[in-house]
C-alpha cells in the first residue's frame, strides 16, 4: 500500500500517560492502605523540580532515620558571615522575645469628657495656713516670755503665729488637760506643741521665779530629769523635730534635748541618756527598747507626752509599743521635787484627720481631752463635719491632674520636668513621689546617667580617654553615697539641675545626709522619693510636688502635696492618672477643697509633650512627637545595652505592679489592677520584653548585704555573751524587718491598709 503522506502529531505531557500501578506487598492491611493513599495523593499533586518534598507523619518509617519537624527547611540557605540572615539570627539569640511598640498608637482615650472652664475670673485664694495678720495676735500676747518671743522674731524670723499655734498656746499654756490638735498640713503644727512645752519648762527654771539654787543658777539642768517625750513615726520626722527644738532652745541653753531613733548606735544613745536630757524625741520602737533595757533612762519626772502624726503611728503598727510606753510611764511616775512641775502627765495627740485609728489611739492615751482646731468660729456645722471625716488642702495650693496613658508616663514626666526647669528661677525645688524603692532607683538612673551612655556609644573606640575624664567629672560632682547627681535628662546649660533620691531601704546616715543636702541646696534640684518624705518634713523652697504614682490613700495624698504651699506660701501640685477607672479619683481630689474643687485643673499628655519637646512653635505639629519617640527609643536602647540597668528596670516594673495592688479598700475600685495594661506599662520602664517573660528572682541588691551584716553582728554579740561580756549594743531585731512584720500583722486585722510599699 502506497504512502498517502498523512502525518499525525500527538502532544503528550512530561509524565507518562499510563503509569504502572505498583502492587504493595507485606505488612498489615492498615500499613498497605496508608501507603496506597499516599501514592494516590502524590499522583494527583505532582511535585515540581526544586520544590521541597512534603513530609508526612504517616506510612512506614525507618527506625534509624531522625525525624525533622515540617516547619524546618530541608536545607539551610548558605550566606556570608556578615549577611543579613546571620545578623538576624545573632540578634534573636541575644535579645529574645522583644517587641518595639509605637509610642503614640493604641493608647486608650479618656472616659470622662473634659470640663469646660468657667468664664468668670477666679480670684486668688487667701492662704489658710499663713501667719495671722492681726497685730494683736503676737507671741507675747499669747503668753510666751519676752525672751522666747524675741528669739522667734530675731533668730527664726517668725513675727506672728498661725491659727493652730494661737489656739494651742491659748489652751496648753493655761491648763494641764490632755489635748487633740487637728490642723491641715503645713500650718505649723510642730511649733504648736513645742512652744508651750518649752515655755512651761522655761517658766519652771526661770531665776525670777525663785527656782534657783544658792548661787542663783537655774535649778533645772540636764541632770534634773526628763520632763517631756515627743514620739514621731519616722526617723526623718524625728530629726526635723529635733532641729526645730534645738533652734528654740538656743535662748534657754540650760535645757537639753536629744533623740533616740532606729538606725543609730544604741551605745552612743545610752551615753547621751546617762549624761541627762530634759526633752527626748524618739521613735516608738527604739523608746520601748530603751525603757525595757536601759536603766539610765529615768521617766519618773515625765509630765508631757506628745504623739505626733497619730494616724501614721497606728498605720505602721505601733499600737502595742504605744500601749507599753504609756503603761510604763504611768507605773514609773513619781512626785517631782522641783517646784512648778505639774502633778500629772499631759498627753498631746496631733493628727491632720480624725480617723478610726486615731480615735482608738486617743482612747488609749487621752483622758478628757480638749479638741484644738484653728479658727473654729469661722466654720459652719457642715464644714466642720466634712473636715472631721475628710482631708483639707491649703487654699493657695494650685493643684492639677494629668490624664496620661501607660505608654506615655515616663516620657511625659520628662517633658514636664523639661518645661518646668526651662527658665532659671521659675521653680527652685520639686519633689517627685513614686510608689516603691526600686522605682526610685530606676528613675534616678534614667534622669542622671544618660550622658554617660551617649558618650560611650558615640566615641567608644576613638575617645576612651575623654570618656573616662567625663565620667570622673560626673562622679566627682555626685555624692559619695550615690544619692545625688546632675539631672542630665531635663537640665540645660543655662539652668543646671541636681537630682536627689530617697527611700527607706537606704542606710540611716545616707537618708539623713541626702535630706540635709536637698534642704540646703541653693541651686534648682529635684528629689525622687517614696512616702518616707511625705510626713511632717518641712523642706524649704519646695515649689512643685509631682505625684507620678498616686498615693495609697487620700490621707497620704494630703501629706504628699503638703510639702509645698507651707505657712502661706504658694505652691503647685500635679498628679498623674491613667485613662479608665483612675479618672474617678478626681472626685476624691475635689473633696479636699472648700469650694468643691473649682480650682482643680485638668491637662493631657499631649499638651505636656508639646510644651516639653516642641517648645512654643505651633507650626511644627509633628516635631514634638518625633522628639518624644527618639527620647523613648534612646532610653530603651540604653536599657538593652546595659544589663545592670535592664535588671533595675525589671525590678522597678515588678515592684510597681505589686505596689499598685495595695491601695486601701475604699479606693481599690479606682485602681483596679485587672484593668492595668501590663504591656503598655512595661514601656514606661524602658522594657521591650513581654510581661510574662519579665522575671527578676531574688531580693533587692541592698537587702542581701544588709542581712549578711546583721547576721555577722548577731554572731559577734553571741560570742561576747558567751565570753561574759556586756551586750549593750545588742539589738533584738532589725528595725526595718520588725516594722514590716508589725505592719503585715496590722493589715491582717483590718484588710484595708497600705502595705510595706508605704515604708519603702
UniProtKB/Swiss-Prot annotation:
Which family does this protein fall into?
Belongs to the DEAD box helicase family. DDX31/DBP7 subfamily.
> Does the entry feature the keyword Nucleotide-binding, yes or no?
yes
Q: Where is the Helicase ATP-binding domain?
A: 170-372
User: What organism, scientifically named, is this protein from?
Assistant: Aspergillus oryzae (strain ATCC 42149 / RIB 40) (Yellow koji mold)
Q: What are the Acidic residues biased-composition ranges?
A: 456-470
Query: Keywords of this protein's UniProt record, alphabetized?
Result: ATP-binding, Helicase, Hydrolase, Nucleotide-binding, Nucleus, Ribosome biogenesis, RNA-binding, rRNA processing
Q: Where is this motif: Q motif?
A: 137-166
Q: Which GO terms describe its cellular component?
A: nucleolus
Q: Where is this motif: DEAD box?
A: 308-311
| EC identifiers of the protein | 3.6.4.13
- Subcellular localization(s) per the UniProt record: Nucleus, Nucleolus
Residue stretches making up the Helicase C-terminal domain: 396-609
| PROSITE patterns named in the record | HELICASE_ATP_BIND_1 (PS51192), HELICASE_CTER (PS51194), Q_MOTIF (PS51195)
- Give the gene symbol: dbp7
What reactions does this protein catalyze? ATP + H2O = ADP + phosphate + H(+)
Additional remark text:
Present with 1460 molecules/cell in log phase SD medium.
Question: Biased-composition ranges for Basic and acidic residues?
Answer: 23-34, 77-94, 701-716
Q: Which residues bind ATP?
A: 183-190
Q: Name one GO biological process term.
A: endonucleolytic cleavage in ITS1 upstream of 5.8S rRNA from tricistronic rRNA transcript (SSU-rRNA, 5.8S rRNA, LSU-rRNA)
Q: Where is this region: Disordered?
A: 23-129, 453-490, 692-760
According to the UniProt entry, its GO molecular function terms are: ATP binding; ATP hydrolysis activity; RNA binding; RNA helicase activity
Q: What is its main location?
A: nucleus
Q: State what protein this is by name.
A: ATP-dependent RNA helicase dbp7
Amino acid at each position: 500500500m502506497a504512502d498517502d503522506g498523512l502525518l499525525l502529531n500527538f502532544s503528550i505531557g512530561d509524565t507518562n500517560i499510563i503509569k504502572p500501578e505498583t502492587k504493595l506487598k507485606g505488612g498489615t492491611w492498615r500499613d498497605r492502605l496508608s501507603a496506597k493513599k499516599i501514592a494516590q495523593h502524590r499522583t494527583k499533586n505532582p511535585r515540581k523540580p526544586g520544590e521541597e518534598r512534603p513530609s508526612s507523619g504517616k506510612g512506614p518509617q525507618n527506625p534509624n532515620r531522625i525525624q525533622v519537624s515540617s516547619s524546618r527547611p530541608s536545607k539551610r540557605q548558605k550566606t556570608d558571615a556578615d549577611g543579613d540572615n546571620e545578623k538576624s539570627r545573632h540578634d534573636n539569640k541575644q535579645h529574645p522575645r522583644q517587641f518595639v511598640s509605637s509610642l503614640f498608637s493604641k493608647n486608650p482615650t479618656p472616659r470622662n469628657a473634659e470640663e469646660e472652664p468657667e468664664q468668670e475670673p477666679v480670684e486668688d485664694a487667701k492662704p489658710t495656713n499663713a501667719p495671722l495678720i492681726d497685730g494683736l495676735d503676737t507671741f507675747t500676747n499669747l503668753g510666751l516670755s519676752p525672751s522666747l518671743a524675741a528669739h522667734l522674731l530675731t533668730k527664726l524670723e517668725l513675727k506672728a503665729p498661725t491659727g493652730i499655734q494661737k489656739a494651742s498656746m491659748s489652751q496648753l499654756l493655761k491648763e494641764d488637760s490632755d489635748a487633740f490638735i487637728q490642723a491641715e498640713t503645713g500650718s505649723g503644727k510642730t511649733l504648736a506643741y513645742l512652744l508651750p512645752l518649752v515655755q512651761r519648762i522655761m517658766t519652771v527654771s526661770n531665776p525670777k521665779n525663785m527656782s534657783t539654787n544658792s548661787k542663783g543658777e537655774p535649778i533645772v539642768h540636764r541632770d534634773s530629769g526628763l520632763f517631756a517625750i515627743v514620739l514621731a513615726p519616722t526617723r526623718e520626722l524625728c530629726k526635723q523635730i529635733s532641729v526645730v527644738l534645738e533652734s528654740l532652745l538656743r535662748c534657754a541653753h540650760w535645757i537639753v534635748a536629744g533623740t533616740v531613733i532606729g538606725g543609730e548606735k544604741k551605745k552612743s544613745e545610752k551615753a547621751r541618756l546617762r549624761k541627762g536630757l530634759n526633752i527626748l524625741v524618739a521613735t516608738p520602737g527604739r523608746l520601748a527598747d530603751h525603757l525595757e533595757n536601759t536603766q539610765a533612762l529615768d521617766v519618773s519626772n515625765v509630765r508631757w507626752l506628745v504623739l505626733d502624726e497619730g494616724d501614721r503611728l497606728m498605720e505602721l503598727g505601733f499600737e502595742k509599743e504605744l500601749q507599753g510606753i504609756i503603761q510604763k510611764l504611768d507605773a514609773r511616775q513619781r512626785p517631782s521635787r522641783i517646784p512648778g512641775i505639774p502633778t500629772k502627765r499631759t498627753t498631746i495627740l496631733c493628727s491632720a484627720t480624725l480617723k478610726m485609728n486615731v480615735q482608738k489611739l486617743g482612747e488609749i492615751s487621752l483622758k478628757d481631752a480638749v479638741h484644738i482646731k484653728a479658727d473654729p468660729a469661722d466654720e459652719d456645722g457642715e464644714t466642720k463635719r466634712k473636715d472631721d471625716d475628710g482631708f483639707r488642702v491649703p487654699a493657695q495650693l494650685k493643684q492639677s491632674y494629668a490624664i496620661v496613658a501607660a505608654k506615655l508616663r515616663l516620657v511625659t514626666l520628662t517633658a514636664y520636668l523639661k518645661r518646668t526647669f526651662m527658665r532659671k528661677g521659675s521653680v527652685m525645688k520639686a519633689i517627685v513621689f513614686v510608689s516603691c524603692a526600686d522605682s526610685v532607683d530606676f528613675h534616678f538612673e534614667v534622669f542622671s546617667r544618660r550622658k554617660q551612655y551617649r558618650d560611650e556609644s558615640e566615641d567608644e573606640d576613638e575617645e576612651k580617654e575623654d570618656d573616662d575624664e567625663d565620667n570622673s567629672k560626673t562622679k566627682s560632682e555626685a555624692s559619695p553615697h550615690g544619692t545625688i547627681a546632675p539631672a542630665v535628662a531635663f537640665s540645660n546649660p543655662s539652668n543646671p539641675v541636681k537630682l536627689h533620691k530617697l527611700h527607706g531601704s537606704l542606710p540611716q546616715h545616707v537618708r539623713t545626709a541626702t535630706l540635709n543636702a536637698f534642704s540646703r541646696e541653693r541651686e534648682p534640684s529635684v528629689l525622687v522619693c517614696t512616702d518616707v518624705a511625705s510626713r511632717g518634713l518641712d523642706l524649704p523652697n519646695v515649689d512643685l510636688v509631682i505625684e507620678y504614682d498616686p498615693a495609697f490613700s487620700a490621707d497620704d495624698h494630703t501629706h504628699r502635696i503638703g510639702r509645698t504651699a507651707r505657712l502661706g506660701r504658694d505652691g503647685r501640685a500635679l498628679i498623674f492618672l491613667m485613662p479608665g477607672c483612675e479618672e474617678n479619683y478626681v472626685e476624691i481630689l475635689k473633696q479636699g477643697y472648700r469650694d468643691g474643687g473649682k480650682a482643680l485643673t485638668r491637662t493631657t499628655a499631649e499638651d505636656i509633650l508639646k510644651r516639653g519637646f516642641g517648645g512654643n512653635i505651633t507650626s511644627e505639629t509633628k516635631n514634638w512627637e518625633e522628639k518624644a519617640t527618639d527620647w523613648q527609643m534612646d532610653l530603651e536602647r540604653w536599657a538593652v545595652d546595659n544589663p545592670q540597668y535592664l535588671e533595675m528596670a525589671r525590678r522597678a516594673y515588678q515592684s510597681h505592679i505589686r505596689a499598685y495592688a495595695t491601695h486601701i479598700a475604699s479606693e481599690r475600685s479606682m485602681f483596679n489592677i485587672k484593668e492595668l495594661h501590663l504591656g503598655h506599662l512595661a514601656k514606661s520602664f524602658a522594657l521591650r520584653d513581654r510581661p510574662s517573660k519579665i522575671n527578676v528572682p531574688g531580693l533587692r541588691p541592698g537587702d542581701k548585704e544588709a542581712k549578711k551584716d546583721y547576721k555577722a553582728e548577731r554572731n559577734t554579740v553571741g560570742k561576747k555573751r558567751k565570753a561574759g561580756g556586756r551586750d549593750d549594743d545588742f539589738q533584738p531585731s532589725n528595725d526595718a524587718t520588725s516594722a514590716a512584720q508589725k505592719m503585715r500583722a496590722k493589715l491582717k486585722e483590718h484588710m484595708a491598709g497600705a502595705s510595706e510599699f508605704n515604708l519603702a
